[in-house]
Amino acid sequence: MSDAYFKGITAALHTAGVCTPTLIIDRARLDRNIDHVIDVLNKGFEYRLVTKSLPSIPLLQYVMRRTGTQRLMCFHLPFLLQLVNHIPSSDILMGKPMPVRAAQEFYDWHSGQTSSMCFAPELQLQWLIDSMERLEQYEKLASQRNLRLRICLEIDVGLHRGGFRNTADFTAALRFIRRSNYLTLSGLMGYEAHITKMPIILGGIKSAFADTQGRYANFLRAAKAELGDHILDNLCINTGGSTTYTLYHNSKLVNEIAAGAALVMPSNFSAETLEHHHKAAFIAAPILKNISKPEIPLTPAISTMLRILGVLPKRACFIYGGNWLADPCYPEDTQHCKIFGRSSNQEMYGIPVDSDIKQDDFIFMT
């Protein structure tokens, strides 16, 4: 990304009167990333939009319109309440198993919301369940309140972050759901974020992907053996993630792919599977203080030596805010100054000596 690109954003921020740290979405880049997702969806998949990666109702609605989906994945009870209020037509899958108390709070809240009554949880909300213990807790809640709950079972396809790990326990859960008057099996979810992190010495991406597909297939065979071949026809068979969705070329095994961060490409989602994606989200932080020859307290002579050794930058700035989970990308070669530590108030960054950036301009992070 060029100087001209970020100078253009800086000018736009000044024109708009922005003077505080701001998250910027480049819609043109976002649209190109959405197009890449649509290319994969056109191979036969439904799309579930991961809301924690795009925590903005207007932004979610924009992506939903572009991709033609009503399917959302939610990870946080307060977010769930917002989604039900503002996007009541959505189909929501919880992206992690929630304490049963969270489910209870949701139904307490929902029962008192006249504006959200067009959202029917028994038809539009799936609770993710990772164990028999949690399944029994949810069944007890449902029986006490006479609720119908849609249950999506989390299966371990190699990540080993929980979920049903073997087909025996999985089959026991299927039988429990089948016998319940309050629970309905709505789907399976097998998350496989480890695939793109697998080192070559262990087989790399290709080997890890094949392994996860084999594990998922075993669970599907177990479901058909227990409930009949027809059972998969109407289930949500979910997988994928931002760094792995591009690996799926047909819908023979799964029918739904989830992704969110791939649309905006933060630094920690960089992967070879996303080399065709563009960074589309940036934090712009105003420069409060532009410092030449920065020093540490009480030690001017040592500070000079530290600058010579490169431990302390030759030029620095203190920004408005800081301590974000993001890496500086403009000015080029800007780096966090470790010797001063982290700060959420005024964080110090070393900037190039020859940069023409000045006070009240912005540094950018992604």
Protein language model regions, located:
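Short, well-ordered loop/turn sites that connect or cap secondary structure elements
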Residues: 356-358
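Active-site-proximal beta-alpha core segment in soluble small-molecule metabolic enzymes
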Residues: 47-199
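Active-site loop/helix belt of alpha/beta enzymes
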Residues: 141, 150, 156-275
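Short, basic/aromatic beta-hairpin or loop at an interaction surface
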Residues: 334-348
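Conserved, mostly hydrophobic/aromatic
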Residues: 30, 52, 83, 153, ...
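A generic structural signal for residues embedded in beta-strands
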Residues: 365-366
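Generic N-terminal amphipathic, Lys/Arg-enriched alpha-helix
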Residues: 5-25
